Amino acid sequence: MPLNRHLRGDLKRKLSNNELTLGSWLTINHQSVIEIMSTAGFEWLCIDIEHSAISISDVLNLIGHIQGNGMQALVRVNENNPVIIKQVMDAGADGVIVPMVNSVQDAEKAVASVRYPSKGIRGVGLSRAQNYGIGFTEYQDWLKNDAVII
């Protein structure tokens, strides 16, 4: 299972219970910003690749810094695109925020992009999220119970 994944499963529970959670948006691609934000008490940071110059290739590194500083990492993707959603989830994101979801079909497409068959369309590429294959079963359980899809 990815780095301390079992210690970072609070966000979905808190959101489901309408509890207060403290997070912020990350639009600057620099680890020092993440370190500063972690000392401010944030529980999660959302990497915004829709409205910033952060690229998909930066996401893996930023997720590692966010999680390494004890916070959960969400990624706001730039579109409801299964390939992009799969990439950020494979990079180890704790969840994804999908913009421009305007219909039930849009929502179903976003959720299917996060999940594996038979509930989704995500292909298996053993990467950071699944601890490079060692924790795939645990990751599937985590994905089902704790992944955040907004």
Residue ranges of predicted features:
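N-terminal amphipathic alpha-helix/helix-capping segment at the start of soluble metabolic enzymes
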Residues: 1-23, 136-147
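Hydrophobic faces of well-ordered beta-strands that scaffold small-molecule active sites
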Residues: 20-26, 45-47, 73-77, 96-98, ...
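Conserved, mostly hydrophobic/aromatic
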Residues: 24, 37, 48, 88, ...
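Short, acidic/polar
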Residues: 26-40, 79-87
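Glycine-rich, proline-tolerant flexible connector loops at the mouths of alpha/beta enzymes
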Residues: 33-61
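Glycine-enriched alpha-helix->loop->beta-strand junction motifs that scaffold or abut catalytic
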Residues: 40-44, 90-95, 115-116
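Alpha-helix-loop-beta-strand connector modules within alpha/beta enzyme cores
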Residues: 56-90, 112-119, 142-146
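Conserved anion-binding
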Residues: 83, 95-150
